[in-house]
Protein backbone atom coordinates (compact mmCIF):
# COMPACT_ATOMS: atom_id res chain seq x y z
CA UNK A 1 0.00 0.00 0.00
CA UNK A 2 2.87 2.39 0.80
CA UNK A 3 4.50 1.73 -2.58
CA UNK A 4 1.22 2.33 -4.38
CA UNK A 5 0.72 5.60 -2.54
CA UNK A 6 4.25 6.75 -3.40
CA UNK A 7 3.80 5.91 -7.09
CA UNK A 8 0.43 7.68 -7.20
CA UNK A 9 1.82 10.84 -5.61
CA UNK A 10 5.03 10.85 -7.66
CA UNK A 11 3.25 10.32 -10.98
CA UNK A 12 0.73 13.02 -10.11
CA UNK A 13 3.41 15.60 -9.30
CA UNK A 14 5.41 14.70 -12.42
CA UNK A 15 2.47 15.20 -14.78
CA UNK A 16 1.49 18.38 -12.93
CA UNK A 17 4.91 19.98 -13.35
CA UNK A 18 5.11 19.01 -17.03
CA UNK A 19 1.77 20.72 -17.70
CA UNK A 20 2.25 23.74 -15.43
CA UNK A 21 5.59 25.05 -16.67
CA UNK A 22 4.54 26.02 -20.23
CA UNK A 23 1.30 27.47 -18.86
CA UNK A 24 3.39 29.54 -16.46
CA UNK A 25 5.28 31.07 -19.39
CA UNK A 26 1.96 32.11 -20.98
CA UNK A 27 0.84 33.64 -17.69
CA UNK A 28 4.10 35.58 -17.48
CA UNK A 29 3.24 37.24 -20.80
CA UNK A 30 -0.12 38.31 -19.35
CA UNK A 31 1.52 39.75 -16.24
CA UNK A 32 4.00 41.66 -18.42
CA UNK A 33 1.08 43.04 -20.45
CA UNK A 34 2.20 41.28 -23.63
CA UNK A 35 -0.75 40.09 -25.75
CA UNK A 36 -0.67 36.41 -26.62
CA UNK A 37 0.30 35.65 -30.25
CA UNK A 38 -2.42 36.63 -32.72
CA UNK A 39 -4.66 38.27 -30.12
CA UNK A 40 -3.46 41.88 -30.11
CA UNK A 41 -5.95 42.98 -32.78
CA UNK A 42 -8.77 41.06 -31.14
CA UNK A 43 -8.04 42.78 -27.84
CA UNK A 44 -8.10 46.25 -29.39
CA UNK A 45 -11.57 45.53 -30.79
CA UNK A 46 -12.71 44.15 -27.41
CA UNK A 47 -11.50 47.22 -25.54
CA UNK A 48 -13.37 49.53 -27.93
CA UNK A 49 -16.58 47.50 -27.82
CA UNK A 50 -16.51 47.20 -24.03
CA UNK A 51 -15.50 50.83 -23.52
CA UNK A 52 -12.33 49.84 -21.67
CA UNK A 53 -9.60 52.46 -21.50
CA UNK A 54 -6.39 50.49 -21.18
CA UNK A 55 -4.59 53.08 -19.04
CA UNK A 56 -2.91 51.60 -16.00
CA UNK A 57 -4.34 52.05 -12.52
CA UNK A 58 -2.87 52.81 -9.14
CA UNK A 59 -3.38 50.29 -6.37
CA UNK A 60 -6.45 51.99 -4.91
CA UNK A 61 -8.15 52.37 -8.29
CA UNK A 62 -7.33 48.74 -9.13
CA UNK A 63 -8.72 47.61 -5.78
CA UNK A 64 -11.93 49.64 -6.13
CA UNK A 65 -12.50 48.16 -9.59
CA UNK A 66 -12.11 44.64 -8.17
CA UNK A 67 -14.47 45.35 -5.26
CA UNK A 68 -17.10 46.99 -7.48
CA UNK A 69 -16.90 44.15 -9.99
CA UNK A 70 -17.54 41.55 -7.30
CA UNK A 71 -20.25 43.58 -5.57
CA UNK A 72 -22.24 43.89 -8.80
CA UNK A 73 -21.76 40.20 -9.51
CA UNK A 74 -23.01 39.30 -6.04
CA UNK A 75 -26.12 41.46 -6.38
CA UNK A 76 -26.94 39.97 -9.79
CA UNK A 77 -26.52 36.41 -8.49
CA UNK A 78 -28.62 37.13 -5.39
CA UNK A 79 -31.47 38.45 -7.55
CA UNK A 80 -31.24 35.49 -9.94
CA UNK A 81 -31.46 32.96 -7.10
CA UNK A 82 -34.42 34.72 -5.50
CA UNK A 83 -36.31 34.86 -8.82
CA UNK A 84 -35.37 31.50 -10.33
CA UNK A 85 -38.89 30.13 -9.82
CA UNK A 86 -40.32 32.51 -12.44
CA UNK A 87 -37.37 32.34 -14.86
CA UNK A 88 -36.85 29.92 -17.78
CA UNK A 89 -34.66 26.80 -18.01
CA UNK A 90 -36.28 25.33 -14.92
CA UNK A 91 -37.80 22.02 -16.09
CA UNK A 92 -38.23 20.76 -12.52
CA UNK A 93 -40.10 23.96 -11.52
CA UNK A 94 -37.81 24.59 -8.56
CA UNK A 95 -38.81 27.64 -6.45
CA UNK A 96 -36.63 30.62 -5.65
CA UNK A 97 -34.32 30.42 -2.65
CA UNK A 98 -35.00 31.97 0.74
CA UNK A 99 -33.27 35.31 1.23
CA UNK A 100 -30.71 33.99 3.71
CA UNK A 101 -29.77 31.00 1.54
CA UNK A 102 -29.62 33.21 -1.57
CA UNK A 103 -27.35 35.66 0.27
CA UNK A 104 -25.12 32.86 1.56
CA UNK A 105 -24.85 31.31 -1.91
CA UNK A 106 -24.19 34.62 -3.68
CA UNK A 107 -21.38 35.54 -1.28
CA UNK A 108 -20.09 31.98 -1.43
CA UNK A 109 -19.63 32.07 -5.20
CA UNK A 110 -18.26 35.61 -5.57
CA UNK A 111 -15.68 34.84 -2.86
CA UNK A 112 -14.46 31.68 -4.64
CA UNK A 113 -15.64 29.61 -1.64
CA UNK A 114 -18.58 27.69 -3.13
CA UNK A 115 -19.89 26.67 0.28
CA UNK A 116 -23.20 24.94 -0.45
CA UNK A 117 -25.95 24.79 2.18
CA UNK A 118 -28.21 23.14 -0.38
CA UNK A 119 -28.37 20.12 -2.71
CA UNK A 120 -27.86 21.33 -6.25
CA UNK A 121 -30.11 18.80 -7.97
CA UNK A 122 -33.10 19.67 -5.76
CA UNK A 123 -32.53 23.42 -5.34
CA UNK A 124 -30.96 25.06 -8.41
CA UNK A 125 -32.53 25.53 -11.85
CA UNK A 126 -30.41 25.12 -14.96
CA UNK A 127 -30.44 28.90 -15.45
CA UNK A 128 -29.11 29.46 -11.94
CA UNK A 129 -26.41 26.86 -12.48
CA UNK A 130 -25.32 28.21 -15.89
CA UNK A 131 -25.81 31.98 -15.75
CA UNK A 132 -25.39 32.38 -12.01
CA UNK A 133 -23.01 29.89 -10.47
CA UNK A 134 -20.87 28.93 -13.47
CA UNK A 135 -20.35 32.57 -14.50
CA UNK A 136 -19.25 33.48 -10.98
CA UNK A 137 -16.87 30.52 -10.98
CA UNK A 138 -15.07 32.20 -13.87
CA UNK A 139 -15.20 35.71 -12.41
CA UNK A 140 -14.16 34.85 -8.85
CA UNK A 141 -11.20 32.87 -10.19
CA UNK A 142 -10.23 35.77 -12.45
CA UNK A 143 -10.38 38.10 -9.44
CA UNK A 144 -7.84 36.08 -7.47
CA UNK A 145 -5.48 35.81 -10.42
CA UNK A 146 -5.77 39.54 -11.16
CA UNK A 147 -4.75 40.40 -7.59
CA UNK A 148 -1.64 38.22 -7.76
CA UNK A 149 -0.82 39.76 -11.16
CA UNK A 150 -0.83 43.19 -9.49
CA UNK A 151 1.35 42.01 -6.60
CA UNK A 152 3.81 40.32 -8.96
CA UNK A 153 4.15 43.54 -10.98
CA UNK A 154 4.87 45.39 -7.74
CA UNK A 155 7.99 43.27 -7.22
CA UNK A 156 9.11 43.54 -10.84
CA UNK A 157 8.64 47.31 -11.22
CA UNK A 158 10.33 50.19 -9.43
CA UNK A 159 9.59 53.88 -8.83
CA UNK A 160 6.14 53.56 -10.37
CA UNK A 161 2.63 54.15 -9.11
CA UNK A 162 0.61 51.82 -11.36
CA UNK A 163 -0.06 48.07 -11.25
CA UNK A 164 -1.89 47.40 -14.51
CA UNK A 165 -5.50 47.74 -15.54
CA UNK A 166 -8.03 45.64 -13.63
CA UNK A 167 -10.53 45.44 -16.49
CA UNK A 168 -7.87 44.37 -18.98
CA UNK A 169 -6.50 41.76 -16.57
CA UNK A 170 -9.93 40.33 -15.74
CA UNK A 171 -10.86 40.11 -19.43
CA UNK A 172 -7.60 38.49 -20.50
CA UNK A 173 -7.66 35.99 -17.65
CA UNK A 174 -11.24 34.97 -18.38
CA UNK A 175 -11.05 34.81 -22.18
CA UNK A 176 -7.50 33.59 -22.83
CA UNK A 177 -6.85 31.42 -19.75
CA UNK A 178 -9.93 30.12 -17.98
CA UNK A 179 -12.28 29.74 -20.95
CA UNK A 180 -9.97 27.72 -23.27
CA UNK A 181 -8.82 25.41 -20.47
CA UNK A 182 -12.39 24.89 -19.29
CA UNK A 183 -13.53 24.05 -22.82
CA UNK A 184 -10.84 21.39 -23.18
CA UNK A 185 -11.56 19.84 -19.78
CA UNK A 186 -15.34 19.95 -20.33
CA UNK A 187 -15.02 18.15 -23.68
CA UNK A 188 -12.92 15.47 -22.01
CA UNK A 189 -15.51 15.05 -19.26
CA UNK A 190 -18.30 14.70 -21.83
CA UNK A 191 -16.29 11.99 -23.60
CA UNK A 192 -15.94 10.18 -20.27
CA UNK A 193 -19.70 10.24 -19.64
CA UNK A 194 -20.42 13.46 -17.72
CA UNK A 195 -23.84 14.85 -18.79
CA UNK A 196 -24.15 18.12 -20.71
CA UNK A 197 -27.78 18.79 -21.63
CA UNK A 198 -30.88 20.80 -20.74
CA UNK A 199 -33.28 17.87 -20.47
CA UNK A 200 -35.74 17.37 -17.65
CA UNK A 201 -34.86 14.73 -15.07
CA UNK A 202 -35.35 11.24 -16.50
CA UNK A 203 -37.69 8.78 -14.72
CA UNK A 204 -36.51 5.19 -14.41
CA UNK A 205 -37.29 2.02 -12.46
CA UNK A 206 -34.56 0.41 -10.37
CA UNK A 207 -33.90 -3.33 -10.25
CA UNK A 208 -35.92 -3.38 -7.03
CA UNK A 209 -38.90 -1.85 -8.83
CA UNK A 210 -38.59 1.59 -7.22
CA UNK A 211 -39.49 4.63 -9.35
CA UNK A 212 -36.78 7.32 -9.27
CA UNK A 213 -35.62 10.38 -11.19
CA UNK A 214 -32.22 10.55 -12.85
CA UNK A 215 -30.87 14.13 -12.62
CA UNK A 216 -29.68 15.76 -15.82
CA UNK A 217 -28.22 19.16 -16.65
CA UNK A 218 -25.22 21.08 -18.03
CA UNK A 219 -22.81 19.34 -15.67
CA UNK A 220 -19.57 19.10 -17.67
CA UNK A 221 -19.30 22.84 -18.35
CA UNK A 222 -19.66 23.71 -14.68
CA UNK A 223 -17.46 20.83 -13.56
CA UNK A 224 -14.49 22.07 -15.60
CA UNK A 225 -14.33 25.60 -14.19
CA UNK A 226 -15.25 24.36 -10.72
CA UNK A 227 -11.85 22.61 -10.68
CA UNK A 228 -9.66 24.88 -12.80
CA UNK A 229 -10.82 27.92 -10.85
CA UNK A 230 -10.45 26.12 -7.49
CA UNK A 231 -14.11 26.92 -6.86
CA UNK A 232 -15.32 23.49 -5.78
CA UNK A 233 -19.10 23.81 -5.79
CA UNK A 234 -20.72 20.67 -7.16
CA UNK A 235 -23.61 20.45 -9.60
CA UNK A 236 -24.91 17.61 -7.41
CA UNK A 237 -24.98 17.28 -3.65
CA UNK A 238 -22.36 14.50 -3.61
CA UNK A 239 -19.95 16.71 -5.59
CA UNK A 240 -17.14 14.77 -7.28
CA UNK A 241 -18.17 11.57 -5.52
CA UNK A 242 -21.24 11.56 -7.81
CA UNK A 243 -20.74 9.32 -10.88
CA UNK A 244 -22.21 12.03 -13.12
CA UNK A 245 -19.53 14.50 -12.00
CA UNK A 246 -16.57 12.14 -11.72
CA UNK A 247 -17.36 8.82 -13.42
CA UNK A 248 -13.97 7.16 -13.86
CA UNK A 249 -10.50 6.90 -12.36
CA UNK A 250 -9.22 8.89 -15.34
CA UNK A 251 -11.60 11.80 -14.73
CA UNK A 252 -10.52 11.67 -11.09
CA UNK A 253 -6.88 12.13 -12.11
CA UNK A 254 -7.76 14.99 -14.47
CA UNK A 255 -9.79 16.66 -11.73
CA UNK A 256 -6.85 16.53 -9.33
CA UNK A 257 -4.51 17.92 -12.00
CA UNK A 258 -6.96 20.69 -12.88
CA UNK A 259 -7.13 21.88 -9.26
CA UNK A 260 -3.37 22.44 -8.93
CA UNK A 261 -2.62 23.43 -12.55
CA UNK A 262 -3.02 27.22 -12.38
CA UNK A 263 -1.63 27.68 -8.82
CA UNK A 264 1.50 25.77 -9.88
CA UNK A 265 1.79 27.68 -13.16
CA UNK A 266 1.57 30.98 -11.26
CA UNK A 267 4.71 30.04 -9.30
CA UNK A 268 6.61 29.58 -12.57
CA UNK A 269 5.15 32.83 -13.89
CA UNK A 270 6.25 34.70 -10.76
CA UNK A 271 9.86 33.63 -11.21
CA UNK A 272 9.77 34.58 -14.88
CA UNK A 273 8.32 38.05 -14.26
CA UNK A 274 10.76 39.00 -11.48
CA UNK A 275 13.63 37.81 -13.73
CA UNK A 276 14.75 35.15 -11.28
CA UNK A 277 13.20 31.75 -11.88
CA UNK A 278 14.80 30.45 -8.69
CA UNK A 279 12.38 32.57 -6.64
CA UNK A 280 9.35 30.87 -8.13
CA UNK A 281 10.93 27.44 -7.73
CA UNK A 282 11.74 28.12 -4.07
CA UNK A 283 8.11 28.98 -3.32
CA UNK A 284 6.98 25.91 -5.25
CA UNK A 285 9.40 23.70 -3.31
CA UNK A 286 8.08 24.97 0.03
CA UNK A 287 4.50 24.32 -1.05
CA UNK A 288 5.33 20.87 -2.40
CA UNK A 289 7.20 19.67 0.69
CA UNK A 290 4.32 20.61 3.00
CA UNK A 291 1.90 18.99 0.56
CA UNK A 292 3.85 15.71 0.41
CA UNK A 293 3.99 15.52 4.21
CA UNK A 294 0.23 16.05 4.48
CA UNK A 295 -0.54 13.44 1.82
CA UNK A 296 1.62 10.90 3.65
CA UNK A 297 -0.16 11.52 6.96
CA UNK A 298 -3.66 11.21 5.48
CA UNK A 299 -2.81 8.06 3.52
CA UNK A 300 -1.28 6.51 6.63
CA UNK A 301 -4.25 7.43 8.81
CA UNK A 302 -6.84 6.14 6.34
CA UNK A 303 -5.05 2.86 5.59
CA UNK A 304 -4.50 2.29 9.31
CA UNK A 305 -8.17 3.07 9.88
CA UNK A 306 -9.91 2.21 13.12
CA UNK A 307 -8.37 -0.81 14.90
CA UNK A 308 -11.59 -1.32 16.87
CA UNK A 309 -13.29 -2.48 13.67
CA UNK A 310 -11.32 -5.72 13.81
CA UNK A 311 -12.57 -6.50 17.32
CA UNK A 312 -16.12 -6.06 16.02
CA UNK A 313 -15.59 -8.67 13.33
CA UNK A 314 -14.71 -6.50 10.33
CA UNK A 315 -12.50 -8.05 7.65
CA UNK A 316 -10.14 -5.08 7.66
CA UNK A 317 -9.40 -1.95 9.62
CA UNK A 318 -9.07 0.07 6.39
CA UNK A 319 -11.29 3.12 6.55
CA UNK A 320 -13.47 2.79 3.43
CA UNK A 321 -16.45 4.55 5.00
CA UNK A 322 -17.55 7.51 2.90
CA UNK A 323 -15.25 6.61 -0.01
CA UNK A 324 -16.09 5.51 -3.53
CA UNK A 325 -14.87 2.00 -4.35
CA UNK A 326 -13.95 3.15 -7.87
CA UNK A 327 -11.33 5.45 -6.37
CA UNK A 328 -10.22 3.64 -3.22
CA UNK A 329 -8.42 4.93 -0.15
CA UNK A 330 -5.24 6.28 -1.73
CA UNK A 331 -6.85 8.34 -4.50
CA UNK A 332 -9.50 9.61 -2.08
CA UNK A 333 -6.82 10.63 0.43
CA UNK A 334 -4.81 12.41 -2.27
CA UNK A 335 -7.90 14.23 -3.53
CA UNK A 336 -8.79 15.35 0.02
CA UNK A 337 -5.37 16.92 0.55
CA UNK A 338 -5.34 18.54 -2.89
CA UNK A 339 -8.78 20.11 -2.52
CA UNK A 340 -8.10 21.56 0.92
CA UNK A 341 -4.55 22.67 0.11
CA UNK A 342 -5.87 24.51 -2.94
CA UNK A 343 -8.96 26.13 -1.38
CA UNK A 344 -11.04 24.23 -3.93
CA UNK A 345 -13.48 22.36 -1.71
CA UNK A 346 -14.55 19.76 -4.29
CA UNK A 347 -14.66 16.29 -2.72
CA UNK A 348 -14.66 12.74 -4.07
CA UNK A 349 -15.15 11.30 -0.59
CA UNK A 350 -16.90 12.43 2.57
CA UNK A 351 -14.35 14.14 4.81
CA UNK A 352 -16.65 13.68 7.80
CA UNK A 353 -16.05 9.92 7.52
CA UNK A 354 -12.25 10.18 7.55
CA UNK A 355 -10.40 9.12 10.67
CA UNK A 356 -9.73 11.78 13.28
CA UNK A 357 -6.18 12.42 12.03
CA UNK A 358 -7.17 11.93 8.40
CA UNK A 359 -9.81 14.64 8.76
CA UNK A 360 -7.60 16.93 10.83
CA UNK A 361 -4.98 17.35 8.09
CA UNK A 362 -7.41 18.84 5.51
CA UNK A 363 -8.75 21.12 8.25
CA UNK A 364 -5.23 22.20 9.19
CA UNK A 365 -4.32 22.91 5.56
CA UNK A 366 -7.18 25.39 5.45
CA UNK A 367 -6.23 26.91 8.78
CA UNK A 368 -2.70 27.82 7.71
CA UNK A 369 -4.29 30.17 5.19
CA UNK A 370 -4.65 28.05 2.05
CA UNK A 371 -1.06 28.82 1.04
CA UNK A 372 0.05 25.30 0.05
CA UNK A 373 -0.60 25.88 -3.68
CA UNK A 374 -3.84 27.53 -2.55
CA UNK A 375 -6.60 28.98 -4.67
CA UNK A 376 -5.93 30.43 -8.12
CA UNK A 377 -4.10 33.65 -7.31
CA UNK A 378 -4.97 33.67 -3.62
CA UNK A 379 -2.58 30.82 -2.85
CA UNK A 380 0.44 32.62 -4.27
CA UNK A 381 -0.33 36.03 -2.79
CA UNK A 382 -0.99 34.31 0.54
CA UNK A 383 2.35 32.52 0.40
CA UNK A 384 4.11 35.75 -0.60
CA UNK A 385 2.82 37.27 2.63
CA UNK A 386 4.58 34.47 4.51
CA UNK A 387 7.69 34.94 2.35
CA UNK A 388 7.90 38.60 3.37
CA UNK A 389 7.24 37.66 6.99
CA UNK A 390 10.05 35.09 6.86
CA UNK A 391 12.39 37.69 5.37
CA UNK A 392 11.44 40.12 8.14
CA UNK A 393 12.12 37.51 10.84
CA UNK A 394 15.48 36.66 9.27
CA UNK A 395 16.34 40.36 9.13
CA UNK A 396 15.61 40.72 12.83
CA UNK A 397 17.86 37.78 13.64
CA UNK A 398 20.88 39.15 11.76
CA UNK A 399 20.25 42.86 12.38
CA UNK A 400 19.69 43.86 8.75
CA UNK A 401 16.86 45.71 7.06
CA UNK A 402 14.71 42.98 5.52
CA UNK A 403 14.61 42.90 1.72
CA UNK A 404 12.86 40.68 -0.78
CA UNK A 405 13.75 40.88 -4.48
CA UNK A 406 15.55 44.14 -3.78
CA UNK A 407 12.52 45.78 -2.15
CA UNK A 408 12.85 46.83 1.49
CA UNK A 409 10.12 45.47 3.77
CA UNK A 410 9.27 48.41 6.04
CA UNK A 411 6.80 49.11 8.83
CA UNK A 412 3.91 49.81 6.44
CA UNK A 413 4.30 46.47 4.71
CA UNK A 414 4.60 44.58 7.99
CA UNK A 415 1.40 46.14 9.33
CA UNK A 416 -0.47 45.08 6.21
CA UNK A 417 1.09 41.59 6.31
CA UNK A 418 0.08 41.13 9.94
CA UNK A 419 -3.44 42.32 9.19
CA UNK A 420 -3.84 39.98 6.21
CA UNK A 421 -2.48 36.94 8.08
CA UNK A 422 -4.60 37.56 11.19
CA UNK A 423 -7.93 38.02 9.39
CA UNK A 424 -8.82 34.37 8.91
CA UNK A 425 -7.65 33.01 12.31
CA UNK A 426 -9.72 35.72 14.00
CA UNK A 427 -12.79 34.81 11.96
CA UNK A 428 -12.36 31.09 12.58
CA UNK A 429 -11.83 31.25 16.33
CA UNK A 430 -14.46 33.90 17.06
CA UNK A 431 -16.95 32.31 14.65
CA UNK A 432 -16.52 28.88 16.22
CA UNK A 433 -16.85 30.34 19.71
CA UNK A 434 -20.04 32.17 18.73
CA UNK A 435 -21.54 29.00 17.26
CA UNK A 436 -20.73 26.98 20.37
CA UNK A 437 -22.07 29.67 22.73
CA UNK A 438 -25.47 30.13 21.09
CA UNK A 439 -28.49 27.87 20.91
CA UNK A 440 -28.89 28.60 17.20
CA UNK A 441 -25.34 27.46 16.55
CA UNK A 442 -25.55 24.28 18.61
CA UNK A 443 -28.92 23.40 17.04
CA UNK A 444 -27.10 22.48 13.84
CA UNK A 445 -24.86 19.93 15.56
CA UNK A 446 -26.00 16.37 14.89
CA UNK A 447 -23.06 14.76 16.72
CA UNK A 448 -21.94 15.31 20.32
CA UNK A 449 -18.46 15.37 21.76
CA UNK A 450 -15.15 16.08 20.01
CA UNK A 451 -16.41 15.10 16.56
CA UNK A 452 -19.37 17.48 16.80
CA UNK A 453 -16.97 20.28 17.74
CA UNK A 454 -14.74 19.30 14.81
CA UNK A 455 -17.69 19.67 12.44
CA UNK A 456 -18.34 23.21 13.67
CA UNK A 457 -14.65 24.14 13.56
CA UNK A 458 -14.32 22.69 10.05
CA UNK A 459 -17.34 24.61 8.75
CA UNK A 460 -16.14 28.00 10.00
CA UNK A 461 -12.57 27.24 8.91
CA UNK A 462 -13.78 26.31 5.43
CA UNK A 463 -15.87 29.46 5.08
CA UNK A 464 -13.30 31.93 6.43
CA UNK A 465 -10.53 30.48 4.24
CA UNK A 466 -12.77 30.31 1.15
CA UNK A 467 -12.53 26.55 0.72
CA UNK A 468 -16.14 25.37 0.78
CA UNK A 469 -15.77 21.71 1.74
CA UNK A 470 -17.55 20.46 4.85
CA UNK A 471 -17.86 17.81 7.50
CA UNK A 472 -21.38 16.82 6.52
CA UNK A 473 -22.75 16.15 9.99
CA UNK A 474 -23.65 19.80 10.54
CA UNK A 475 -27.08 21.19 9.73
CA UNK A 476 -25.94 24.47 8.19
CA UNK A 477 -29.09 25.31 6.21
CA UNK A 478 -30.47 27.66 8.88
CA UNK A 479 -30.56 31.48 9.04
CA UNK A 480 -27.91 31.52 11.79
CA UNK A 481 -25.42 29.40 9.88
CA UNK A 482 -26.19 31.01 6.52
CA UNK A 483 -25.51 34.49 7.90
CA UNK A 484 -22.50 33.54 10.05
CA UNK A 485 -20.75 31.70 7.24
CA UNK A 486 -21.67 34.39 4.69
CA UNK A 487 -19.96 36.98 6.90
CA UNK A 488 -16.89 34.76 7.29
CA UNK A 489 -16.67 34.15 3.54
CA UNK A 490 -17.02 37.81 2.63
CA UNK A 491 -14.53 39.13 5.18
CA UNK A 492 -12.14 36.20 4.70
CA UNK A 493 -11.88 36.99 0.99
CA UNK A 494 -11.84 40.75 0.68
CA UNK A 495 -10.26 41.72 4.02
CA UNK A 496 -7.18 39.86 2.77
CA UNK A 497 -7.27 41.29 -0.76
CA UNK A 498 -7.36 44.89 0.56
CA UNK A 499 -4.05 44.76 2.51
CA UNK A 500 -2.43 42.72 -0.29
CA UNK A 501 -3.24 45.49 -2.76
CA UNK A 502 -1.99 48.10 -0.28
CA UNK A 503 1.30 46.19 -0.04
CA UNK A 504 1.51 46.10 -3.83
CA UNK A 505 0.96 49.85 -4.01
CA UNK A 506 3.74 50.46 -1.51
CA UNK A 507 6.26 48.08 -3.12
CA UNK A 508 5.80 49.27 -6.70
CA UNK A 509 6.95 52.76 -5.70
CA UNK A 510 10.20 51.51 -4.19
CA UNK A 511 13.56 51.25 -5.89
CA UNK A 512 15.04 47.80 -6.45
CA UNK A 513 18.23 47.68 -4.41
CA UNK A 514 21.15 45.71 -5.89
CA UNK A 515 22.11 42.59 -3.96
CA UNK A 516 25.06 42.90 -1.59
CA UNK A 517 27.16 40.23 0.15
CA UNK A 518 24.92 40.56 3.20
CA UNK A 519 21.64 40.15 1.33
CA UNK A 520 19.61 37.14 2.43
CA UNK A 521 19.33 34.57 -0.35
CA UNK A 522 15.65 33.78 -0.84
CA UNK A 523 16.02 30.89 -3.26
CA UNK A 524 18.18 28.33 -1.46
CA UNK A 525 17.38 25.37 0.78
CA UNK A 526 17.97 27.40 3.95
CA UNK A 527 15.31 29.94 3.04
CA UNK A 528 12.89 27.22 1.92
CA UNK A 529 13.27 25.70 5.39
CA UNK A 530 12.77 29.11 7.01
CA UNK A 531 9.64 29.70 4.94
CA UNK A 532 8.18 26.32 5.84
CA UNK A 533 8.97 26.96 9.50
CA UNK A 534 7.27 30.36 9.35
CA UNK A 535 4.13 28.86 7.82
CA UNK A 536 4.05 26.08 10.41
CA UNK A 537 4.76 28.26 13.43
CA UNK A 538 2.68 31.33 12.61
CA UNK A 539 -0.08 29.68 10.64
CA UNK A 540 -0.48 26.45 12.58
CA UNK A 541 0.18 27.10 16.26
CA UNK A 542 -2.78 29.48 16.35
CA UNK A 543 -5.16 26.54 16.12
CA UNK A 544 -3.49 23.94 18.37
CA UNK A 545 -5.92 24.53 21.30
CA UNK A 546 -8.95 24.26 19.01
CA UNK A 547 -7.60 21.13 17.32
CA UNK A 548 -6.91 19.62 20.74
CA UNK A 549 -10.61 19.94 21.61
CA UNK A 550 -11.70 18.37 18.33
CA UNK A 551 -9.80 15.89 16.15
CA UNK A 552 -6.92 15.28 18.58
CA UNK A 553 -9.31 14.49 21.45
CA UNK A 554 -11.27 12.19 19.14
CA UNK A 555 -8.09 10.41 18.02
CA UNK A 556 -6.81 9.76 21.54
CA UNK A 557 -10.25 8.55 22.66
CA UNK A 558 -9.88 5.63 20.22
CA UNK A 559 -6.51 4.49 21.57
UniProtKB/Swiss-Prot annotation:
Cellular compartment(s): Cell inner membrane
InterPro entries found in the cross-reference section: KdpA
Organism this protein belongs to: Klebsiella pneumoniae subsp. pneumoniae (strain ATCC 700721 / MGH 78578)
Residue ranges crossing the lipid bilayer per the database entry: 5-25, 63-83, 131-151, 173-193, 254-274, 282-302, 327-347, 356-376, 379-399, 416-436, 483-503, 525-545
Chain's role: Part of the high-affinity ATP-driven potassium transport (or Kdp) system, which catalyzes the hydrolysis of ATP coupled with the electrogenic transport of potassium into the cytoplasm. This subunit binds the periplasmic potassium ions and delivers the ions to the membrane domain of KdpB through an intramembrane tunnel.
Keyword Zinc included in the entry's annotation: no
Signal peptide start and end residues: none
Entry keywords, A to Z: Cell inner membrane, Cell membrane, Ion transport, Membrane, Potassium, Potassium transport, Transmembrane, Transmembrane helix, Transport
Keyword Transmembrane helix appears in the UniProt entry: yes
Family matches, as NCBIfam families: kdpA
Subunit-level organization: The system is composed of three essential subunits: KdpA, KdpB and KdpC.
Annotated membrane topology: Multi-pass membrane protein
Recorded family membership: Belongs to the KdpA family.
Name used for this protein in its record: Potassium-transporting ATPase potassium-binding subunit
Pfam families for the chain: KdpA
Gene Ontology MF annotations: P-type potassium transmembrane transporter activity; potassium ion binding
One GO location term (cellular component): plasma membrane
Amino acid sequence: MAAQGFLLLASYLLVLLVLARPLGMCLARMVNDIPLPGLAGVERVLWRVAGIRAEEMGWLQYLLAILLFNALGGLALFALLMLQGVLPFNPQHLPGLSWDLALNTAISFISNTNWQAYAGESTMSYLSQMVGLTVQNFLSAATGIAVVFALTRAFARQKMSTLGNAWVDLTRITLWLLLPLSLLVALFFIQQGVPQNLQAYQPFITLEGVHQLLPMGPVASQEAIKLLGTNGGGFFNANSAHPFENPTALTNLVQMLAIFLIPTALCFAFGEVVSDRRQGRAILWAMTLIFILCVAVVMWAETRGNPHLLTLGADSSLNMEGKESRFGILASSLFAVITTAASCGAVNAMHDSFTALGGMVPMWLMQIGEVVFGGVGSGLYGMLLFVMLAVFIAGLMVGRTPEYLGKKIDVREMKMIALAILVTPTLVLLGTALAMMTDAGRAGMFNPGPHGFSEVLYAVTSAANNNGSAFAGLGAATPFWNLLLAFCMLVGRFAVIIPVMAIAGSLVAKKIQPASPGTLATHDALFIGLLIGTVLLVGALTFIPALALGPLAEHFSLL
